[in-house]
Swiss-Prot record:
InterPro entries in the cross-refs: Beta_defensin_dom (IPR025933)
Cellular component, GO annotation: extracellular region
A Pfam family of this chain: Defensin_beta_2
Protein name: Beta-defensin 107A
Covalent S-S links between cysteines: C37-C51, C41-C60
Subcellular location per the Swiss-Prot or TrEMBL entry: Secreted
Protein task: Has antibacterial activity.
GO biological process, alphabetically ordered: defense response to bacterium; innate immune response
Residues making up the signal peptide according to the UniProt record: 1-22
Family per record: Belongs to the beta-defensin family.
Length: 66
């Protein structure tokens, strides 16, 4: 019975690691698009994608003036 809890804990930790790796990858893509990850974009910024991190779900970039 104890082995079940150890296996469950290991699977839970692996799932957390893979989510973190994906969030880091999306943050790098956001930086490549010259944006930054924030919880909410400011009024003068445009949402250009998603970072999908828990605390910073949006990729924001300054709007271009025409």
């Amino acid at each position: 019975m104890k082995i079940f809890f150890f296996i469950f804990a290991a699977l839970f930790l692996l799932a957390q690691i893979f989510q973190a790796r994906t969030a880091i990858h999306r943050a790098l893509i956001c930086k490549r698009m010259e944006g930054h990850c924030e919880a909410e974009c400011l009024t003068f910024e445009a949402k250009i994608g998603g970072c999908r991190a828990e605390l910073a779900p949006f990729c924001c970039k300054n709007r271009k003036k025409h």
